[in-house]
Structure formats: C-alpha cells, structure tokens
Amino acid sequence: MAIGASEPLIVRSSAASEDGSEQSQAGKYLSVLGLHTDEQLSQAIDDVFSSYGDPTPADEVFIQPMAQDVALSGVVMTCDPDSGLPYCIVSYDESGDTTVVTSGGNGTRTYIFVPGHDVPKPLRGLLPAIDEVVNIVGVKEVDIEFAITNEATVVVFQVRPITTRGIKDGTWGDRIDGLLRSLNRVKASIEDVNRFNDGQGLVGHTLGVMPDLNPAELIGTKPRSLAASLYRHLLSDTAWATAREKFGYRDLRSIPLVHMIGGTPYVSVSASVASFIPATVPEPVAQKVIADAQRKLNQEPELHDKIEFRVVPTCLKPRMRDGQWRQQFSSLSDDEWASYLDALGILTNRIVSGGALFDRAAEGIERLESAAGQVKQNAGRGLLDVLSLIEKARVHGTVLFAEVARAAFVATDILKSLEAEQLVPQGFLDAIVCASDAVGAQLVHDFAVLEPAAFLKLHGHIRPGTYEITVPRYDDPRGQYFDWVNRSVRGNPTETPAAAPVLSPAQISRVCLEFDQTGYAFGWPEFEAFAMNAIQARERVKHAFSWLVSDALEQLALIGADLGLNREELSFLTLPEIALAVEMRKDLSSFLRAVARRNRRAWETTRHLRLPDVLCSPKDIFGFHVFESRPSFITGNTVEGLVTGVDDISLKDGILFIENADPGFDWVFTRGIKGIVTKFGGENSHMSIRARELGLPAVIGAGSRFESWRNARVIRLECAVQRVEILR
C-alpha cells in the first residue's frame, strides 16, 4: 500500500479480545501515529500485532488517516461499565494530541452527565454524534473514541461495545427514567439540607465528601447503614462542635456536620467553616468569612480535603495579615480583617497554652482503656450493653479526640507555615511527628519484637474500617493481616522514638522574633512541647476510643448470631433501630431482620449513583466534572516499586494503592511496603500522619489520578518535587 504525501496515517489496534461483549481490553494495546512512508506503515503494523501477545486468527489492525486540526479528543462511554446505569462519561483532552486519553496521560478531564442534560460548550457537538453512532450500530452501550476539530467537526475513530457488570433489566428508556427518579430524590435531599442550613443562618450551600471530618476517607462514599450511623453518632452529630466550642470557636452543637445524601456522606461546608470562626467575631463578619471561603472552594474544588489549610484559617499563622489570605477574604474591610485575625490570635494562644488539655487526654485514655479491659464478650449480654459501650466511647473518647485533633491541626498548620517561610528546615514537621512516639510507630515496633499473643493483646481490637462490622479485627483469624513467619517491617524499629529535631540558637531566635511579631503569647520551647504532645495525644486517644467501638461491634455480632443474624445483616442496622429493638423486648430477630432488609434495599438503590465530590448546586448531580485533586506529598523522599493492593499476596517492597484508609489499616506498615498512594485523604489525614511517623513516601488524596496510576505496573514517587511517574 503506497501512502500519499497529503496526510499521515495511524495504525490502531483491533485485537479480537478488545471488542467482545463479555470483556474489553480497550486502550491496552499499541497504536502508532504519524506514518508517512510505506516502511513506517509496515513496521507499525508489525509492532501493533506484536503488542497483542499470543496471536489469534481473528486479530486485526485498523489503518486510518490521521485527524488534522484537532481541538479536543477523547473517549465517551454511553453507560457506566460498573453498574450499567445510563450515565454518559466523557474523558477528553484539549491539547490536540489524540492519544492522551487512551494512553492515560496527564491533563485529561472527565465529565459525567445524564442523557438529556446540558454539557459544557466544547462537548455539545458530541451529542448528535453519539446518537448517530448508537443508531448505526444498534447498541446503546458503546465506547466511542472521537476527536472534535477546530471547525467543530466530530471525527469518530473507533466504536466498541461496553462490557457492563451491572444490571441491564428493562429498556434503555426505563433505565434512564429510573436513574432520573433516583437523582430527583437526591436533589430533594440536597434542597432539604439547604433549607435547614438557611434556617440556621448559614450562608452558602456547598457540600463535600472530604472537608473537615473526611467521611469519604473514614467510612467511604457508600457506607452501610451501621457504619454511617456509628460515625455520625460518635463524631459528626455533636462531638466535633462540642470540642470546638470549648476552645472558643462558634457554637454549632445543634447543627449536624454530615448529611447522608444519595447514600453518600456529605459535609456541610458552611457549617464546617462557621465552626472554625472565633465566637467573638461579629455575625456580619462571620457571614462574609463563610461566603468567601465557599467561593474559594467552589472555584478550586480540588482543595476539598485541605480546607483547614487552604480555604479558611482555623488559627493565626505567621505572616497572615497580607498576601494570599487577605486576597482570599476580599469582602472584609481592612478593619474587619484585622479584628478577625486578632480574634484568631486570642484563640490560638488559648489552644497552645492550654496545657490542661493533655492532662485530660491522659486521664481519658486511662478511662477508655479501663472500660475496654472490663468488657467480656459473651452472648449473655444484650443490645443495651452494646449501646452502653458505644455511649462510653462517645462520652469519654470522641469529644476528647476532637479536642486533641484540633490541637494537632493547629500545631501542624503553624509548623507548615514556618516551613513555608523557611524559618525552620524543610521536613521539620515530618521530624516532629517521627519524634512524637505515636501509635503507628509503636505498632510497627511491637510487631517486630513481640510474640503474636502479646502483640494482639495490645492491638488485636483494631479493625480496618473502624465502624464496619463485616471486617475482621486484627485478632480475628479470618483477617490474616500479619505474616508472623516473614516479618518485614520498614527500617529497624526500636523502642526509643527518634530524637526531636533541634533548631540552632540562631533559628530559635528568628522563630521567636516571628512569634512576637505575629502576636503569640508563647515562645518556641512551649510551642514545640505543645506540638509533640498534641500529635501524640491525638493518636493515643483515637487508638483508645476505637477499642470500645470495636468491642461493641463484636458484642453485637455475638448477639446477632444468637438471634440468627449474620454480620452482613447486622451491617444494615442503625443505632436508633437497635435502640428501638431494646424497647420492644420481643420478636427481636424478625424485627431486626426486616429492618436490615429494608435498609439494604435502600443502599442497593443508591450505591451506584455517581455523585460529585463537591456539590455547589443541586443541579450538579445531573452533570459534573471530575476534578483533578491536588495530592499531599509526604516526606521529601523518592521511591520506586511495583504497584500493589491490599489483596495482593505480597506487599513487600511495593507501593501500596488504597482508596481510603482509617487506623485499622496500620497493618500494612508491617509488610515492608516502600510507599503508599491513597485516593482520599488530606494533609492531616490518618495515612498522612502514619507516613510522617514512619518516614514513608506517600501521595495522599490522589483523586481522579488514582486509577491511572494504579493501572501501572511500576511507579516512582518523587515527593520532594511533588511528582508521580509511571515507569511501566
């Protein structure tokens, strides 16, 4: 075949395994672009065939003229391949390179929408092309590779059937109608939350899955009923606000922070921001702060897991009076801004100088561990005992945890500010965390030196998924979390924690001068002690209160077994329903089973709904961009290794990919991993803290980039320059 001089060709893969109705390998094989000669074409055909591996007679290649003058290119799927729901999912790139999307390159954007709803202007010409392709091939579920030229001409490169693992019942129209009914119920729920917040005087309607208490990280985006109920009762109903009110922030104890919408836990951003404003700030100024902070998040939704660091100040930091923060709150007059910062300064001094907090933390840990030690799990106990354990965890643990966590946030924020202003060396925060002798490092040390029985006596209550009853604890043989024969912890754990980093006299002098100019009533020695105490107390209180929660779930499992209910069924109960069962005192088994079935049906109807991580308006649920997150890079180290997941047989020397991880996933640090990447999480989330403790390179909160990185075989994390590179 002779190639004309006028236009280059492209050879695309068309292997038999790519286009079957039972599986799809789209994007797996090679495509070769820019072919101008017969020799190039011949070599490209051979190379593409070679990329298939073992050949079959049905394998082909596809030769096309290359599209010219491309403005936008990408892939559109006309349904969600995981659920079969009729979402249109468009992944596209505006660089003009037609291979970026299929090769998993950077810069790709994704827009998800329901048929019949509007799309961004650059994509509107794609809609009639989708309809035309579907009519031609006679299949609704298709994957279309396309380009749009600068003249708005849509070019279709390839069409494949989509392999769906979801439900295909009913006609296509029935499925669209069903999705719209579900989304209209979600829209009504959002409007209910908005009306409630309006009634509480909270301006703005932004919701998110990761601000503040990080529900997506701790219970996931589609939690079961019991996990969601426990999390809200223990943390997000009142504990969060009670702790902040004690420090001098605004009192929001009558306002829940987290709302279940479409089966997803969403944080009310207006409530969160309001709770970080000092109580002495006048109402008109507070309203401006809330509005400005939400405007910032709406403009940069990728900051949803960093709101305390980037969206609203929760303490006074050095050099805040001018620059970025002042510009961000432009609706405040200079006098209002000054008085707002003065109020933050008074509150910051109170938090840092409040040494009694750590005495109370030590007493609280002792009470929690004593209560846990008195628990004897046996079937003779009843549901009332379960509720009592949970209440002890709330009364003695979660409010205290919220207090020490807030103190640790303040410590971290000030330390990060000192690093940013080069008043302390880069990596100083990581060194402080390493020296705090917190729970993660202690667990790794204990695993290295203790016999299994002794280790499990200390840590056996920990559960990956603190609130999820279906997940085995460390001391449950079903879990098989630890390799006791081949122990491979990172480094050489010792009983003595790392020494605290030491500043030179000149550095201390500069920091103290900065503290004086900021208006702090404390010096460097007092702040350093506060920071180490806060970081250590946060982890120890978390460890202690989770013990009672874990024991309560095990007690519930024993009672459930006696009633003929398994853990799967129990996971669909809620605390109010368990309390109602206690009052009934008869026919518990039938009542609880009926409740579990009803809640499971509700969960099944919402668990495949695609909802945005940040909701600015109810209409967003019908069409939204999946924004590219700004991950937090922990430590300044570089590491490369095989991509691994928690279900892999061996994690040793791998870089672990995990969507979300609470304290129960600390077992992974006993498996000799070299690094970690999470989909959800922020600068101060659990895995960030653990990575700092252990000096482990980590990328926390990868968001939309998580999947493309996870699909690699070998990857490099360059944390100092905040870069992830796919090696192969």
State where each predicted segment sits.
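Glycine-rich active-site/cofactor-binding loop and its immediate structural neighborhood
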Residues: 25-53
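Structural motif
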Residues: 10, 62, 655-659, 676-677
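ATP-grasp fold ATP-binding core
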Residues: 2-26, 30-31, 55-69, 144-145, ...
